[in-house]
């Protein structure tokens, strides 16, 4: 309240949180774009050689975990979105299984639709819990094949979903 008894309300948006499962070279521009938007980014990978915080200066955390222990090692409820992009079928299956049992609202999977269907078959009943939240192939069709173009399409889709937008022109 001010001296006239007026109350002002300031709307403050919560900072989006992004989990990237897979710290390969193509995750670098995804992390960079997310950090440029002010998002809090955590990267995880099961491969020790990929877990190098120096490659991801925009990330809050870069963590080596076993893919099958994602839900035990990372508090998934703190994330608004997750992108699975390790390029390792078995690891991606473990990441998706943990995310299926979570409340993460947006889950993206890098790769073609055939890969998604193969992983869904392996997930069994868990696939049903994930189907409505999963975007696979991840990203908007913006054109371009470079890691940066793909990262832009991914982050654009996450931004649209988090803000309940279609990602269509104004």
Regions found by a protein language model. Give the residues of each.
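Short acidic/glycine-rich loop or secondary-structure boundary segments that cap or lie
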Residues: 28-29, 50-53, 71-73, 91-93, ...
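Fold-independent oxyanion-binding glycine-rich loops
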Residues: 23, 46, 67, 86-88, ...
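Short beta->alpha junction loops/turns
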Residues: 23, 88-89, 112, 143
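Adenosine-phosphate binding glycine-rich loop
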Residues: 105, 109-170
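ADP-ribose/adenylate-binding Rossmann-like module
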Residues: 44-45, 81, 86-87, 93, ...
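Short amphipathic alpha-helix with an adjacent loop that forms part of the alpha/beta core around
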Residues: 68-78
